Amino acid sequence: MMPERIILAYSGGLDTSVAINWIGKETSHEVVAVVIDLGQGGEDMEVVRQRALDCGAVEAIVVDARDEFAEGYCLPTVLNNALYMDRYPLVSAISRPLIVKHLVAAARAHGGSIVAHGCTGKGNDQVRFEVGFASLAPDLEILAPVRDYAWTREKAIAFAEENAIPINVTKRSPFSIDQNVWGRAVETGFLEHLWHAPTKEVYSYTDDPTINWNTPDEVIVGFEHGVPVSIDGSPVSMLGAIEALNRRAGAQGVGRLDVVEDRLVGIKSREIYEAPGAMVLITAHAELEHVTLERELGRFKRQTDRRWAELVYDGLWYSPLKTALESFVAATQQHVTGEVRMVLHGGHIAVNGRRSAESLYDFNLATYDEGDTFDQSAARGFVYVYGLPSKLAARRDLR
């Protein structure tokens, strides 16, 4: 009889490296490790694949999903100007549904009836993975050894040392890091103390904002129907736009975020994020919407932007509400075409120019100089009618 196969989402890090070895010892099941290349950089994917085999996986598969991630997951984040709690551009959250998709495909291809992840019981990712599996493949069983067997980082490190698992994490450098082309997330260690400032070794995607203080970088991002299509006039793919802006904005220290966020499980958590390209693209897209969207549409979309970010953060990528919101957002992007110019400097993004053939900005109506076509004589009656409800309420309250 063939051994049962477990399909594991493998990152190459501590928890999933330990999980391969532990699953083999405790269950006698075979592990197929699935590595998803989301443009995380760092180690070569072949090195990560070989580590999975060295840890005991019977097979290790690398899926190049960089373009798919950029087009299908990062782009919607831009279209929705998605910042959870008005700050976090969903660096990790948007990657989980794509990983789920490829794990389900691997389970079907390799005859696995169990999928596994290395998430803890305190984080959001357990929800994102398992709700995703329930949405795409409710027949699959789920194994979560880190959560279900209460592994701590100390226990995982000890297990790795005892079993000669090839992973370089020690108690002296206990950061938990998740990264992809959209950004980088760092947590645990001394960062769990809210008063401790992050030190330079925490950062990787961004330089010290003071290094290039004398050489600010001006960049123009072009959009067609909300989609980034050019940088400084040169055509780019979505992946190319992210990568180019990661380099340029990262060199200016742009995209560093020190956030205390409300996790889905009910606790607050401190995270350090680096998302230079993401923050530039979201800033530019939102600015172009200010120019091209009618006032009421813009107001309402800002509400749906926030709700979309919350749904994705909370692991509801496949929810009917998110799908419906995206249909609405697609309709809003018809006129979001044009260019936004920004200066990247000292860790900040400063918009200093916008232009669009679809602009609702009318110079002749807006100017205070000669040539003003705004009929100011109409304002008196408008103000009277507009303020009438407040006037009536105030008169009543003074009785």
Curated annotation (Swiss-Prot):
The keyword Ligase applies. Its main location: cytoplasm. Keywords: Amino-acid biosynthesis, Arginine biosynthesis, ATP-binding, Cytoplasm, Ligase, Nucleotide-binding. Pathway: Amino-acid biosynthesis; L-arginine biosynthesis; L-arginine from L-ornithine and carbamoyl phosphate: step 2/3. ATP binds at residues 9-17, 118. L-citrulline binds at residues 88, 124, 128, 176, 261, 273. Pfam families: Arginosuc_syn_C (PF20979), Arginosuc_synth (PF00764). The keyword ATP-binding applies. It is found in: Cytoplasm. Its EC number is 6.3.4.5. One of its GO terms (cellular component) is cytoplasm. L-aspartate binds at residues 120, 124-125. It catalyses: L-citrulline + L-aspartate + ATP = 2-(N(omega)-L-arginino)succinate + AMP + diphosphate + H(+). One of its GO terms (molecular function) is argininosuccinate synthase activity. One of its GO terms (biological process) is argininosuccinate metabolic process. Belongs to the argininosuccinate synthase family. Type 1 subfamily. Homotetramer. NCBIfam families: argG (TIGR00032), PRK00509.1 (NF001770). This is Argininosuccinate synthase.
